[in-house]
Amino acid sequence: MGATALPPIWQMYLKDHRIYTFKNWPFLEDCSCTPERMAEAGFIHCPTENEPDLAQCFFCFKELEGWEPDDNPIEEHRKHSPGCAFLTVKKQVEELTVSEFLKLDKQRAKNKIAKETNNKQKEFEETRRTVRQSIEQLAALR
């Protein structure tokens, strides 16, 4: 089975697929945070208009931006997300047993749910604030 037959998120376990996301990465040579080293640390490149160097760990979903040429991706990842299980894997993904892989991916799925829940809570809180302000403004018109 080729890598393209894998679900897209499982393709991110393969370093070459993560490297591919760094097409427009600003640091390519003579620096520590090359696409290769970023991918080794579990990062994918997900730039935005305001954050052209935004990278996210595909596993713990930690987002980091503001990279400097001398930043070490693995050290930065450990510093900002010390509990990321991807950093503790000692084997290449191709060497994992099915059981090891599924256990690892279960943790990734939990991380994704936690990230999405946190984002929804922030979104809800912002909406709540906006609605409350509108209610207070309407009440002031009485």
From Swiss-Prot:
Reported modifications of this chain: Ubiquitinated by the Cul9-RING ubiquitin-protein ligase complex, leading to its degradation. Ubiquitination is required for centrosomal targeting. Deubiquitinated by USP35 or USP38; leading to stabilization.
Site positions for Interaction with FBXL7: E126
Cellular compartments per GO CC: apical plasma membrane; centriole; chromosome passenger complex; chromosome, centromeric region; cytoplasm; cytoplasmic microtubule; cytosol; interphase microtubule organizing center
PROSITE patterns given in the database record: BIR_REPEAT_2
Chief location: cytoplasm
Residue(s) carrying Phosphothreonine: T34, T48, T117
Record-linked Pfam families: BIR
Recorded GO MF terms: cysteine-type endopeptidase inhibitor activity; cysteine-type endopeptidase inhibitor activity involved in apoptotic process; enzyme binding; identical protein binding; microtubule binding; protein heterodimerization activity; protein homodimerization activity; protein-folding chaperone binding
BIR repeat ranges per the UniProt record: 18-88
Keywords linked to the UniProt accession: Acetylation, Apoptosis, Cell cycle, Cell division, Centromere, Chromosome, Chromosome partition, Cytoplasm, Cytoskeleton, Kinetochore, Metal-binding, Microtubule, Mitosis, Nucleus, Phosphoprotein, Protease inhibitor, Repressor, Thiol protease inhibitor, Transcription, Transcription regulation, Ubl conjugation, Zinc
Modified residues (N6-acetyllysine): K23, K90, K110, K112, K115
Record flagged with keyword Protein biosynthesis: no
Cell compartments where the protein resides: Cytoplasm; Nucleus; Chromosome; Chromosome, Centromere
SUPFAM superfamilies: Inhibitor of apoptosis (IAP) repeat
GO process terms (BP): apoptotic process; cell division; cellular response to ethanol; cellular response to stem cell factor stimulus; chromosome segregation; establishment of chromosome localization; G2/M transition of mitotic cell cycle; meiosis I
This protein's record includes keyword Calcium: no
Binding sites annotated in the UniProt record for Zn(2+): C57, C60, H77, C84
Family according to the record: Belongs to the IAP family.
Record's function text: Multitasking protein that has dual roles in promoting cell proliferation and preventing apoptosis. Component of a chromosome passage protein complex (CPC) which is essential for chromosome alignment and segregation during mitosis and cytokinesis. Acts as an important regulator of the localization of this complex; directs CPC movement to different locations from the inner centromere during prometaphase to midbody during cytokinesis and participates in the organization of the center spindle by associating with polymerized microtubules.
Assembly description: Monomer or homodimer. Exists as a homodimer in the apo state and as a monomer in the CPC-bound state. The monomer protects cells against apoptosis more efficiently than the dimer. Only the dimeric form is capable of enhancing tubulin stability in cells. When phosphorylated, interacts with LAMTOR5/HBXIP; the resulting complex binds pro-CASP9, as well as active CASP9, but much less efficiently.
Domain notes: The BIR repeat is necessary and sufficient for LAMTOR5 binding.
Name of the protein described by the UniProt record: Baculoviral IAP repeat-containing protein 5
Organism: Rattus norvegicus (Rat)
Native organism taxonomy: Eukaryota, Metazoa, Chordata, Craniata, Vertebrata
